[in-house]
Amino acid sequence: MNTARLNQGTPLLLNAVSKHYAENIVLNQLDLHIPAGQFVAVVGRSGGGKSTLLHLLAGLETPTAGDVLAGTTPLAEIQDDTRMMFQDARLLPWKSVIDNVGLGLKGQWRDAARRALAAAGLENRAGEWPAALSGGQKQRVALARALIHRPGLLLLDEPLGALDALTRLEMQDLIVSLWQQHGFTVLLVTHDVSEAVAMADRVLLIEEGKISLDLTVDIPRPRRLGSVRLAELEAEVLQRVMRRGHSEQLIRRHG
């Protein structure tokens, strides 16, 4: 693990990144810079390239063209600093909660696993089986499993999409709190625009493989649900998502 990034997160730089599947162009010469420790949400219609972007950053796929860098280093060279959460928590049902958190680790890892579970609010469920947990609790285990590695980059692919509304809000608060404590870089893919503006520093809209909106969320934390400014930003993003025409021009809003 690269300890130099533990307190500041992984900076990301994508230069002219494209991803093709035969004749289907999913990402089209995408350029993106994300400073270390920034919380970025990515929204857009299905098939626009959101999850493909996360898969490239996670090393699950390779770009057809372009460079994916952590600062000046190819991201693939420091993949151990990256962790990813999915909508399905992907817990092994035959292993206890604490064993799922420590999956793949060697040596004296149980104390670290207990600390990670405590940070995720599940310290009292360490010895239980995944089948005994609710959907939200399973995602807390998945979050603890990511935290134990002290990642520089946390990738979130719709991890809250299957949760009920109250549990979803609780998980949003937990993820933001842990991000503030640990300083890792976060990329969240979500179809929920309200979730994006509530959690992120910055919201990107990907359309037809390109970034068509790059919006700074200029709201102090903690953010109050139902605030006028949150509603205005949500409406701005939704208006862009729902519009009929597609412009190639990048729209930026700062401050």
UniProtKB/Swiss-Prot annotation:
<dbReference type="InterPro" id="IPR003439">
    <property type="entry name" value="ABC_transporter-like_ATP-bd"/>
</dbReference>
<dbReference type="Pfam" id="PF00005">
    <property type="entry name" value="ABC_tran"/>
</dbReference>
<keyword id="KW-0813">Transport</keyword>
<keyword id="KW-0547">Nucleotide-binding</keyword>
<comment type="function">
    <text>Part of the ABC transporter complex SsuABC involved in aliphatic sulfonates import. Responsible for energy coupling to the transport system.</text>
</comment>
<keyword id="KW-0997">Cell inner membrane</keyword>
<keyword id="KW-1003">Cell membrane</keyword>
<dbReference type="InterPro" id="IPR027417">
    <property type="entry name" value="P-loop_NTPase"/>
</dbReference>
<dbReference type="InterPro" id="IPR050166">
    <property type="entry name" value="ABC_transporter_ATP-bind"/>
</dbReference>
<dbReference type="InterPro" id="IPR003593">
    <property type="entry name" value="AAA+_ATPase"/>
</dbReference>
<dbReference type="InterPro" id="IPR017871">
    <property type="entry name" value="ABC_transporter-like_CS"/>
</dbReference>
<keyword id="KW-0067">ATP-binding</keyword>
<protein>
    <recommendedName>
        <fullName>Aliphatic sulfonates import ATP-binding protein SsuB</fullName>
        <ecNumber>7.6.2.14</ecNumber>
    </recommendedName>
</protein>
<keyword id="KW-1278">Translocase</keyword>
<dbReference type="GO" id="GO:0005524">
    <property type="term" value="F:ATP binding"/>
</dbReference>
<keyword id="KW-0472">Membrane</keyword>
<comment type="similarity">
    <text>Belongs to the ABC transporter superfamily. Aliphatic sulfonates importer (TC 3.A.1.17.2) family.</text>
</comment>
<comment type="subunit">
    <text>The complex is composed of two ATP-binding proteins (SsuB), two transmembrane proteins (SsuC) and a solute-binding protein (SsuA).</text>
</comment>
<feature type="binding site">
    <location>
        <begin position="44"/>
        <end position="51"/>
    </location>
    <ligand>
        <name>ATP</name>
    </ligand>
</feature>
<dbReference type="GO" id="GO:0005886">
    <property type="term" value="C:plasma membrane"/>
</dbReference>
<dbReference type="GO" id="GO:0016887">
    <property type="term" value="F:ATP hydrolysis activity"/>
</dbReference>
<feature type="domain" description="ABC transporter">
    <location>
        <begin position="12"/>
        <end position="233"/>
    </location>
</feature>
